[in-house]
Amino acid sequence: MKFYKPKPRSILSFDVGIKRIGLAYCDPLCITSNILPAVKRVEDNKELKIIRNHIKKFNLTGFIVGLPLDEKGKMTPQAIDCMNYGQLLSNELKLPFSYVNEHSSTWESSNRFGIKKDKSGLIDSFAAKVILEQWIKEGPELEELAGKGQIKY
């Protein structure tokens, strides 16, 4: 499937992990991207309050969620968790969104930004920035996906 450069808009990018979620956002023209502090995943999804605050503060109009597919582009258990979290975000935030193949984004951000052995979440947010930059170049366009069922593994 070939994607095309999406229309410019200010969006939030998520690198969803088991313990933390890396965050990055771009300006409405998709010219600059910036990282935000990673948030810890907590019970009852209490991190959504922080995410909502970022959306309001930066006037974000959509979001993307990285999917850690394997080398062949197939789903992994972590990718399924990311898809389910994306659906949760869609249902809670009521914003258009899309998934982006993030295979090797953490490795790329580690090499590109020189981050090693990070436990602060900085590498997660830089991975979200890499995912965002990929989306800006390649898409796909954001869609209204709220209410779709969760994927089981």
Curated annotation (Swiss-Prot):
Highest taxon of the lineage: Bacteria
Main subcellular localisation: cytoplasm
Name of the protein in its database record: Putative pre-16S rRNA nuclease
Organism: Prochlorococcus marinus (strain MIT 9312)
HAMAP family attached to this UniProt entry: Nuclease_YqgF
Enzyme class: hydrolase
Alphabetized UniProt keyword annotations: Cytoplasm, Hydrolase, Nuclease, Ribosome biogenesis
Chain's role: Could be a nuclease involved in processing of the 5'-end of pre-16S rRNA.
EC numbers for this chain: 3.1.-.-
GO biological process: rRNA 5'-end processing
Lineage of the species this protein comes from: Bacteria, Bacillati, Cyanobacteriota, Cyanophyceae, Synechococcales
Record's subcellular location: Cytoplasm
GO CC annotation, single: cytosol
Entry's family note: Belongs to the YqgF nuclease family.
Secretion signal, residue range per the UniProt entry: none
Classification via NCBIfam families: RNAse_H_YqgF
MF-aspect GO terms: nuclease activity
Pfam family of the protein (one): RuvX
